[in-house]
Amino acid sequence: MEALLQGLQRQDRMGALQDSCEAELQELMKQIDIMLDHKRSQWEAETETMKTRLELKEQELNCALDREERLNQEVRRLRQQLIQQEEETQNKTTQYEAQLSGFKEELNRLKKSYEKVQKKHLRSEMKAKAEEERSEVSRLTRRLEEFRQRSLDWEKQRLLYQQQLAGLEAQRKTLIEQTEMYQHQSHNRKQMLEQTSLVGRSELQNLSGQLHRANDSLCAKEEELETLKIQLRCAVEGQKRAEHETELSKQAVQALKEEKAELRATLQAHTEFLQGSRVQKHELLPEGYRGSEVLRENNSIRSVEERLQEMGQVGGETEVEAIRSKLSVSRMNEHRLQAEVTCLEDSVESVTSQCQLLAKELKGKEEYFHGVKEDHQKCLSENKKLKGQLSQAELTHKSVLDGMRKEISQLTQELHQRDIRMASSAGIDWERKIKAERQRAEREAAEHRMSLNALENLRQENCRLSELLQTQEPDVAQALVNLEQANQRLQRELLQTQEKLELIAQRRESEIQNAVDSISQELLNKQEQELRIMQERLKVYEQEMQTFRSQQDAASSGSSLESIFSEVWKEQATGSPISAASVDSAIEPVEDLASSLPVPPTSPANAVASRFLQEEEQRSHELLQRLNAHIEELKQESQRTVEHFTQAR
């Protein structure tokens, strides 16, 4: 009985422990559900971010292709404009050459007419005015000396002009050197771009390898998660079975407790009955003794009866009858007591057998509860292992995603820095070129002013000579007037050509400045538009993420543990290539973007940067070509003007 009571007490303690374990297990399952919901929302958010980034990179690629197409169209348009300008310059040069040839013919004609007039005048005056001719000859010789002196001065001016031409040639050489330097710089830039592109390709290859490895590791982790999910399902089912069995065991324990109470009551009744029977036995023992004495007396009475019968005594019959009645009563009491004793013995045997059966059942229940407790401990240990594995997998996944985010941020920062450096270097180059162009234009303007001053001096000298000739000879004066008119006409044409050259130079400078301003403005506008588009996309993405999170929270509140695991597995199965591709910009579809471009996808940032650098290099190369062509045109025009001045003089 004491062993039975101890077993029941142990069962009570086991039930309390089982209740506490069930509460802890339910709390643990709730925590696991919350953690899985949180991680699922994080994974969904990350997959959506990777998808949006992939779409953004594809749109950027399309924009870059459209930009390249527009640049090609602009290049074709500029080429057509260049061809038209070359045709116009050729037409102008032919016109100027025709005008110069006309001027030369007119000068030759005037010289011939002047010589004819002079010869005619000399012939007519030769005979009549010999002395005057002599004086005139002497005067003319003096004038010839003066003209020789002036010719020496003109020779000096010619030397000065030659020096100016040498200076212009030196300027041309310096400009050629500058162009070569620009070409060398562009070649160096091209090499640097090629090196950066090679480095970017190597980085892309490394990233693609890392992403492939990450994909393999993610696949392995997905398989591990599948096995863990199966194990967790088995553990949950085992836990449910254990809970059901614990409920059944509780019911059995409750029934056993009731049976125990009933058995205790029956035992108490049986013990009381045994005690009463023992008391009755003790009470009936003297009666038995008395019955035995009565039997002995009965025997003695029988013997007495026999004797009386023998003796024929009738007076003792009444006593014998009384003794017989007493004996019958004592026999009945003895039989009743024996029956009660046998009943009590049978009841005691049945109670002892029931107690043995209950002890065996309690022992079996204790063993069953011990097994259930061990299973519960195993389930708890398996749950802990699963939690550890899940936390480790989450940490590794989080570390991988953090690394990918860091790489993407570094690539974007490098792209922005490269854009800033390229824009600053391009602006500095343009400023230098514009400054050099302005200095050259100022030098040309100074040279033009010097030539104008020289022409003004020549005009004054011609006026003075014409006045002297008018005072002496009318024919010579008329010829000089004609020459002066021709000279004035040539000066007007020279001024017109100078004005045209200045207008052309101003127009070219304004075109260059407008082109620089328009290109810089276009670049700034494009960058601002791209930034606005990125900001709008980020806002839209944040709104979509908020709505998605709200929907996910509403959907996850009514989902069970098994549905959560299945959804997480599906999301991983669909989202793992994106997360792998997302730094591949971040994973495999992006890697298809870098090779097609694919990465964060094959680092789309490097592909866009390389294309942007190639476009900037093309633009700089085209601008250098245009500047070289403009410089060559200005040099040719300056040479033409110098030749025109020398021929006119």
Swiss-Prot record:
Residues 19-185, 222-556, 612-645 form a coiled coil. The modification Phosphoserine is found at residue 560. The keyword Iron does not apply. Disulfide bonds: none annotated. It holds the Pfam family CEP63. The keyword Manganese does not apply. GO terms for biological process: cell division; centriole replication; de novo centriole assembly involved in multi-ciliated epithelial cell differentiation; DNA damage checkpoint signaling; signal transduction in response to DNA damage; spindle assembly. Belongs to the CEP63 family. InterPro entries: Cep63/Deup1_N. This is Centrosomal protein of 63 kDa-A. Required for normal spindle assembly. Plays a key role in mother-centriole-dependent centriole duplication. Plays a role in DNA damage response. Following DNA damage, such as double-strand breaks (DSBs), is removed from centrosomes; this leads to the inactivation of spindle assembly and delay in mitotic progression. One of its GO terms (cellular component) is spindle pole. Keywords: Cell cycle, Cell division, Coiled coil, Cytoplasm, Cytoskeleton, DNA damage, Mitosis, Phosphoprotein.
